[in-house]
Amino acid sequence: MMSGEYGDFNNTNNKELSLLDKLKKAWINEKYAPNLLNYEDVIIKEVMEKIEEKESLCASAISNINLQFTANIYEMEIERLKYIIKCYLVQRIKKIDKFYSSILLEIENDEYDSYKLLSEFEINYCQKYKALMDGYFKNTLLNSIPKDFQKMDSNSINRPFLNTFVFCKPREDLGDFLVDDETIDFKKTSIYFLKYLPIKSLVEGGKMDLI
């Protein structure tokens, strides 16, 4: 371990590995869940703080030949963290682009807390994207059809298909759980292939991971 003027250049510790694991799980869950999951604000903030900390250590170690090898390792860790964050955010933007109307409608109907579901940037993006798409459809399609058919009701909004099948794994033993009239004893060591909707609350509650 090298410390002092240049900070602690120890290998990645258990806390950092745990944070990396949480970030990867957030990305994979977002990737395989058909709906938009709550924005992992705490995890993202912690990861960004860790990136800034490592970047600061690397910058201060440039002139110290004894720390350059470890600094190079840190730079690789930084790039890995940035890559996973990028993948996570891209998955979310894809869903916002696809389901923007249903997301905003559910927020409007108080089905979701907007500040848990979306980051501040995502809220602004979703609203602006909807305004852009509404304007596009109005100018290219709706103006050319009778007014009686111009209004879009909630049934015509694109929504995620929640009955898709997914692979999932409990984070802990959950005991008996009712899934489509069948009782399943969820074990931490087992992997299941089930419809998403019955386990949606477990995924959103952090008790089940998608794989």
Curated annotation (Swiss-Prot):
Subcellular location: Nucleus
Biological process terms in GO annotation: DNA replication; DNA-templated DNA replication; double-strand break repair via break-induced replication
Name of the featured protein: DNA replication complex GINS protein SLD5
Subunit relationships: Component of the GINS complex which is a heterotetramer of gins1, gins2, gins3 and gins4.
Family label: Belongs to the GINS4/SLD5 family.
InterPro entries: GINS_A, GINS_bundle-like_dom_sf, GINS_Sld5, SLD5_C, Sld5_GINS_A
GO cellular-component term (any): GINS complex
Source organism superkingdom: Eukaryota
Chief site of localization: nucleus
Described function: The GINS complex plays an essential role in the initiation of DNA replication.
Biological source species: Dictyostelium discoideum (Social amoeba)
Keywords: DNA replication, Nucleus
Lineage of origin: Eukaryota, Amoebozoa, Evosea, Eumycetozoa, Dictyostelia
